């Protein structure tokens, strides 16, 4: 099993069972821009596709870092995979059994807050919630009432501050109220638990 997520051109996977890369090829998902793989547990139907996928990612020209997150045992699993996959042209960071909310430092993925929950399964198993933060929408009236030059409108939607003609302009001068984010939870292979 596997869930593929495309967020602003960057890609993530939750689990990587056998056949994951075949399905990804079939639907033209691409391999180069995968930045994050979240593993729920170490049963074969959730991790066995990782060996081939890591090699395919390297063969596709990936050089950006990859982060793999998983339950207790993911570090040992990755060490075993390193024996089979001797060379990768990108760095792999492994986070084992995270308990606190976290975000990645990647320019785009830093907008995603990830939290975990322990699940009830025959082995260590993690459920994931991804909270996709959303920026406030552009407010034309606000920009005009704050006398922000139109040439800066786009920049202030992307940057917090812009200095123009010796005057400082802030994104809050052109943006409306904060928007509620989008939450995606992936809970699999568990008995019913109160925490869910």
Regions found by a protein language model. Give the residues of each.
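Conserved beta-strand hairpin/beta-sheet module of binuclear metal-dependent hydrolase folds
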Residues: 1-27, 65, 128-130, 178-187
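Binuclear metal-ion centers of metallo-dependent hydrolases, dominated by the metallo-beta-lactamase
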Residues: 99-103, 194-196
């Amino acid at each position: 099993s596997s869930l593929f997520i495309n967020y602003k051109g960057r890609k993530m996977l939750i689990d990587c069972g056998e056949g994951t890369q075949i399905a990804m090829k079939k639907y033209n998902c691409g391999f180069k821009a995968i930045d994050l793989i979240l593993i729920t547990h170490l049963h074969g139907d959730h991790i066995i596709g990782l060996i081939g996928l890591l090699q395919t990612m390297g063969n596709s020209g990936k050089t950006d870092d990859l982060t793999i997150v998983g339950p207790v045992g993911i570090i040992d699993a990755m060490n075993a995979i390193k024996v089979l996959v001797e060379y990768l042209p990108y760095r792999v960071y492994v986070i084992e059994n995270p308990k606190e909310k976290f975000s990645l430092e990647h320019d785009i993925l830093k907008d995603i807050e990830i939290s975990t929950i322990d699940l009830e399964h025959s082995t260590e198993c993690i459920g994931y919630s991804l909270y996709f933060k959303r920026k406030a929408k552009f407010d034309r009236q606000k920009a005009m009432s704050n006398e922000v030059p139109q040439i800066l409108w786009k920049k202030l939607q992307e940057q917090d501050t812009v200095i123009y003609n010796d005057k400082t302009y802030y994104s809050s001068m052109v943006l409306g109220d904060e928007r509620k984010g989008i939450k995606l939870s992936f809970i699999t292979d568990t008995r019913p638990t109160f925490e869910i």
